[in-house]
Amino acid sequence: SSAASDVYKRQDIQVLMKDSVDANGLQRMQVSDSKTSFTYKGKEYQSSVVRRPDDSLPVVINEQGDKFVDNSITLRITSGGKSIVDKVFTKESFASLVDAKFMKHSILEGLVYDKTTPQGIVYAASVCYPQSDLYIPLSITVSADGKISLAKEELLEDLHETDSI
């Protein structure tokens, strides 16, 4: 498939971020910290996702020449006081899944808890062109023992499709 087919347009534009702009004209997304609890295979889990603009990452410049600070996102999952995952993701974490040209001008925008499946705990991540509706949806699956696998999310245009057995 062509790389362009992996890029989706958002339906709801509210997602567009409120950026702050500093003296150097660099735009930053706000720091966000979201906590979730869920049960997986009979155990209680707590998860925290902290997104922060990370000045150690290369600055992203869009076609208009606006400059953006890319984000790093820390995912922590604990169960019964034990750490299952404590990992920092950057857009480079997904380099093997995202077209290099898209990668260059995009930022790691977000990571949210999605669902649990027999394979593990699933988080949805997105790499996007800053302040646009173009993004690549990605998924992070964490197994019960903390192994992490990354995949590109294939968004089904037709939700009525059933998987053939």
Outline where the language-model segments fall.
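Acidic, glycine-rich flexible loop segments
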Residues: 96-137
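Short hydrophobic/aromatic-rich beta-strand segments that constitute the beta-sheet cores
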Residues: 85-86, 123, 149-152
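Surface-exposed acidic loop/strand-edge motifs in secreted or periplasmic proteins
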Residues: 16-110
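Short, small-residue-biased leader/transition segments that mark boundaries at the very start
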Residues: 1-8
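A short local loop/turn or secondary-structure capping micro-motif enriched for an aromatic residue
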Residues: 55-56, 93-96, 131-132, 157-161
